[in-house]
Amino acid sequence: MKATIIFLLLAQVSWAGPFQQRGLFDFMLEDEASGIGPEDRIHEVLDLEPLGPVCPFRCQCHLRVVQCSDLGLDKVPKDLPPDTTLLDLQNNKITEIKDGDFKNLKNLHALILVNNKISKISPGAFTPLVKLERLYLSKNHLKELPEKMPKTLQELRVHENEITKVRKAVFNGLNQMIVVELGTNPLKSSGIENGAFQGMKKLSYIRIADTNITTIPPGLPPSLTELHLDGNKITKVDAASLRGLNNLAKLGLSFNSISAVDNGSLANTPHLRELHLDNNKLIKVPGGLADHKYIQVVYLHNNNISAVGSNDFCPPGYNTKKASYSGVSLFSNPVQYWEIQPSTFRCVYVRSAIQLGNYK
């Protein structure tokens, strides 16, 4: 009985025809025999919905990242995949951002528009971007900061534009903002509204370098840990300008025209660790360094300092600082290194951390 069953199974297999590779022409012949023409089949295929989001022409899409950089685009591409989390449009020729350019991009976290020709952004252009965290608009032709930026924004970079005004209203409600980069713009001190940055409660980093400002912007938020104002036209550091910056750890004021630092200025930054005052017009070491508990790095090279006192950097006698210096630079000043008492740097961590050199 078993043998009979096996024989029948083998016979059934042997009756089956061999596998044949079939092409589009074979299916078209079948359609012709069944009364379905090739045109009907083509229309049927065209009517099918796409299986997933379509990548814009010439762009590259991978893992919710849409890269459309370096394509010579003059506008934002249409029909961007709605699940996009990062959109890269840098190095194009886009001149304007319009309402609706980013519709349906509710999952976008980062938008890169660097190095375009953008001079206009419609007030509601970024409204659909309810999850946007990073907005990069550097190297464009913007004269003002964009309005109605998403409240989720954490990082804004708009250096190398044509911005002349920073209004307080632009940053209202941006409570998640951490980084603001405004360098290399034709900004003047009068163009920054008093307290423009005050409303951003989490703001940690501001860079306004290589502009025309002559004073430290007033009303900076107490949350700041880094303030970079290098390459400006600041002439003086007064105590009021640093008041309330209790969390500031790094202050960059290199390449300005600062001739004086008011007494008490550094006392307003009790947690300062790095102070960059090189390439200015200082005639003496700023007061208050010896009493500062945490400061570790002080750059004073390329100034007009002609004398250094034995207590300018360290507490009197051999009282120890909370933190020892790890870097002190005084080279390219009129003061001669042999005129400085060895005990002046008694609170420096290692001697190699001191850079004196000669004045040229």
Swiss-Prot record:
GO biological process: negative regulation of angiogenesis; negative regulation of endothelial cell migration; negative regulation of vascular endothelial growth factor signaling pathway; positive regulation of macroautophagy; positive regulation of mitochondrial depolarization; positive regulation of mitochondrial fission; positive regulation of phosphatidylinositol 3-kinase/protein kinase B signal transduction; positive regulation of transcription by RNA polymerase II
Pfam families from the UniProt entry: LRR_8 (PF13855), LRRNT (PF01462)
Cellular location(s): Secreted, Extracellular space, Extracellular matrix; Secreted
Superkingdom of the source species: Eukaryota
Keywords per UniProt: Disulfide bond, Extracellular matrix, Glycoprotein, Leucine-rich repeat, Proteoglycan, Repeat, Secreted, Signal
SUPFAM superfamilies given in the database record: L domain-like
Signal peptide residues on this chain, from the entry's feature table: 1-16
InterPro entries: Leu-rich_rpt, Leu-rich_rpt_typical-subtyp, LRR_dom_sf, LRRNT, SLRP, SLRP_I_decor/aspor/byglycan
Post-translational modification: The attached glycosaminoglycan chain can be either chondroitin sulfate or dermatan sulfate depending upon the tissue of origin.
GO molecular function: extracellular matrix binding; glycosaminoglycan binding
Positions of disulphide bridges: 55-61, 59-68, 314-347
Prosegment location in residue numbers: 17-30
Regions annotated as coiled coil: none
Functional note: May affect the rate of fibrils formation.
UniProt record similarity statement: Belongs to the small leucine-rich proteoglycan (SLRP) family. SLRP class I subfamily.
Assembly information from the UniProt record: Binds to type I and type II collagen, fibronectin and TGF-beta. Forms a ternary complex with MFAP2 and ELN. Interacts with DPT.
Name assigned to this protein: Decorin
Species whose genome carries this gene: Equus caballus (Horse)
